[in-house]
């Protein structure tokens, strides 16, 4: 993805989860000018020409270390190990400095459900897998956390190389994601876009001042690192697995070290060649929106609930483009003006990012519809939680390395050309990915810091007979099947596999993918088992969301004053305890009286009303809590637009508890005037009635009204 594509794709998540607007604080514009004046970028000298043996300075030594993510990733001793190995920063320059790269090893483990009687003794395969990460710039920790429970570990060790310039592998702009209050928080779209370029230049200036050779951070050197790692680990061959940018690197590695690769799987494919097709992001987005809407139309309930889904959504994007969102900010350290501004890339980027994971698909029409309705009604209160801060680099991307790759791999011309064409073909969707002219500005920054495009011949299409699976998710919004079709002819021994109704990187995210990969790696030349991709079915779409700002209202309150959350929590907590106790007592008491053959003291119908009140209250609180938990599990962004539709019934039950509580209090008072009641009976009835009234009031006060 491009610099501004990544900004657009993650915009909504960035503001909601981590506020990761990128800007390097250590190198401000004035520092940039000084650095350039003091030491202009020089052309390569004769002493820095390519050496005859590119690996002459590689040591091929691996140094064990304690995993940098220990304490942050849950694993037991012996399951995961880490190491560093040293490589030249630029193998084409004889005087290049050395840097260390971080490698994580996820050790193969016996499956918990392994049946030795049926399958025999479990044995680890001796041919490991090297996983090539995406981004470019994605840090290793996120992959470790995800793959530690992936089925691929049921048979083989999995190595994850944290590529040069990322995380613990000599990240030269570790502070890139730190938030600068003045950089991107502006009411002007052009200034907002320019902030991304300023961040890029600040990072490069800082790297230059630290004597970082930015020209060494490219896909070709990355492939050489993988080659060197194989030799350092002592493997004659291993299996290749790469997704997204890892598919680009995978193609380069297939050319770099063909003798060292036993079999390969590349997924979420982008052609290695510098082809403009990849950058038609708006075209790809329109494609998956059409697929989603067509699938929705095939479902009678979805078609009824969400008519004109995409047309309304595009109109919402246009509306925000014309009228950016302005909100009172919560955290004035991050928003010194007290205001926060959101643009159409937020509205466009949220569903785009959700297309990556197929688990989001059932609720995606509901989310798009709710997001659209938010814009139509200009009800942006839920977005205030995005101004509460969080900071840090929540997306585990080393943006400096990403930018260096885009420079050295020569992306800018393709970006400019494809974005201009998308502007003609898809004028609304293209707006969310930025102005095409930014590509020219990016190219100028690249040139100023010695990160010029490498020769195009190094990126020619792969021609190989290595056994390879080329995999795509049909609903991938960023690397769709048409991209894979470009490179398929170069794989003489390749098989193209599509996963219907799957997103970005199905071999990573589909539940049966581990078994699918293991069977392939066990017998690459054998008949391919396609039962996994063939098991993918059209999602069962959920209905409309229950439009409520209740949870975000509470979150905003907590962000503004942590102590203030005590009132609504204690309020609903006490009611929940009373309801739960009452539901048990009023249900079991009649049974106990039957067993004991004792009569009930007359209460004028108060007991039955108390029972109904307790049941309504328990169902309401439990239903809202369950709906919130389900939303978080399926798609946390749903919480910004509402809750699953059925939780509206839970809110109605809570409102019903109000009049039931009032009736219960009246009946209890009436019964006490007619016949003295034991203190325990009276107290139980009065507390249950009061809890019913309190719950109804809580629902009204905190924004959970179902109408």
Give residue spans per PLM region.
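Catalytic-loop region of hydrolases
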Residues: 25-190, 307-319, 323, 451-454, ...
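Alpha/beta-hydrolase fold active-site neighborhood
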Residues: 50-54, 315-465, 562-628, 650-653
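A catalytic-pocket lid/entrance helix-loop region that shapes and gates access to the active site
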Residues: 174-184, 252-316, 351, 372-376, ...
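Short beta-strand/loop motif that positions the catalytic acidic residue
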Residues: 464, 470-472
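Conserved alpha/beta-hydrolase "acid-adjacent" motif
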Residues: 478-482
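Alpha-helical transmembrane segments forming the membrane-embedded cores
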Residues: 592-707
């Amino acid at each position: 993805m491009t610099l501004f594509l990544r900004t657009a794709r993650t915009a909504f998540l960035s503001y909601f989860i981590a506020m990761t607007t990128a800007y390097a604080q250590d190198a401000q514009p004035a520092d940039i000018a000084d650095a350039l004046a003091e030491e202009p970028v020089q052309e390569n000298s004769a002493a820095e020409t390519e050496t005859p043996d590119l690996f002459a300075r590689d040591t091929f030594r691996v140094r064990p270390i304690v995993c940098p993510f220990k304490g942050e990733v849950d694993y037991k001793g012996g399951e995961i190990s880490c190491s560093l190995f040293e490589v030249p920063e630029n193998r084409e320059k004889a005087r290049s400095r050395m840097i260390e790269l971080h490698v994580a090893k996820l050790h193969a483990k016996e499956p918990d459900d392994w049946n030795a009687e049926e399958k025999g003794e479990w044995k680890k395969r001796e041919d490991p897998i090297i996983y090539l990460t995406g981004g470019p710039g994605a840090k290793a920790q996120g992959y470790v956390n995800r793959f530690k429970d992936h089925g691929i570990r049921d048979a083989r060790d999995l190595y994850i190389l944290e590529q040069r310039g990322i995380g613990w592998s000599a990240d030269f702009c570790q502070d890139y994601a730190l938030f600068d209050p003045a950089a991107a928080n502006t009411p002007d779209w052009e200034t907002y876009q320019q902030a991304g370029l300023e961040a890029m230049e600040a990072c490069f200036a800082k790297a230059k001042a630290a004597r970082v050779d930015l020209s060494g951070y490219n896909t070709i050197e990355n492939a050489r690192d993988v080659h060197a790692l194989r030799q350092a680990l002592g493997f004659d061959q291993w299996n290749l697995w790469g997704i997204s940018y890892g598919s680009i690197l995978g193609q380069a590695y297939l050319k770099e070290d063909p003798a060292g690769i036993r079999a390969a799987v590349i997924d979420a494919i982008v052609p290695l060649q510098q082809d403009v097709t990849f950058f038609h992001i708006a075209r790809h987005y329109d494609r998956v929106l059409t697929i989603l809407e067509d699938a929705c139309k095939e479902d009678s309930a979805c078609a009824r609930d969400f008519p004109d889904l995409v047309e309304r959504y595009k109109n919402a994007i246009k509306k925000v483009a014309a009228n950016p969102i302005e909100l009172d900010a919560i955290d004035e350290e991050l928003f010194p003006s007290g205001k926060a501004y959101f643009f159409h890339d937020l509205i466009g980027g949220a569903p785009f990012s959700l297309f990556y994971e197929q688990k989001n698909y059932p609720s995606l029409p509901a989310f798009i519809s709710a997001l659209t309705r938010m814009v139509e009604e200009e009800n942006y209160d839920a977005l205030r939680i995005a101004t509460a801060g969080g900071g840090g680099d929540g997306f585990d991307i080393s943006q400096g390395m990403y930018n260096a790759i885009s420079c050295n791999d020569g992306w800018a011309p393709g970006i400019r050309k494809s974005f201009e064409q998308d502007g003609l073909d898809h004028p609304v969707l293209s707006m969310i990915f930025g102005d095409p002219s930014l590509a020219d500005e990016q190219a100028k920054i690249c040139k100023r810091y010695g990160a010029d495009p490498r020769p195009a011949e190094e990126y020619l299409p792969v021609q190989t007979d290595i056994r390879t699976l080329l995999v795509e998710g049909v609903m991938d919004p960023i690397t769709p099947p048409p991209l894979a079709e470009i490179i398929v002819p170069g794989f003489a021994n390749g098989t193209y596999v599509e996963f219907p109704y799957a997103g970005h990187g199905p071999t990573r995210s589909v539940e049966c993918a581990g078994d699918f990969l293991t069977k392939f790696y066990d017998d690459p030349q054998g008949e391919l088992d396609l039962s996994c991709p063939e098991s993918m079915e059209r999602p069962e779409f959920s209905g409309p969301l229950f439009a409520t700002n209740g949870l975000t209202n509470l979150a905003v309150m907590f962000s503004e004053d942590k102590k203030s959350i005590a009132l609504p929590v204690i309020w609903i907590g006490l009611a929940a305890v009373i309801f739960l106790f009452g539901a048990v007592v009023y249900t079991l008491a009649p049974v106990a009286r039957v067993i004991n053959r004792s009569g009930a003291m007359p209460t004028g119908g108060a007991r039955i009303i108390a029972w109904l009140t307790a049941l309504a209250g328990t169902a309401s609180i439990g239903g809202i809590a369950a709906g919130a938990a389900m939303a978080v599990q399926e798609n946390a962004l749903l919480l910004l637009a509402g809750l699953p539709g059925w939780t509206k019934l839970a809110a109605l039950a809570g409102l019903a508890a109000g009049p039931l509580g009032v009736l219960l209090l009246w009946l209890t008072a009436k019964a006490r005037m007619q016949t003295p009641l034991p203190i325990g009976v009276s107290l139980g009835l009065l507390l249950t009635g009061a809890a019913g009234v309190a719950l109804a009031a809580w629902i009204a006060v905190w924004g959970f009204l179902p109408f």
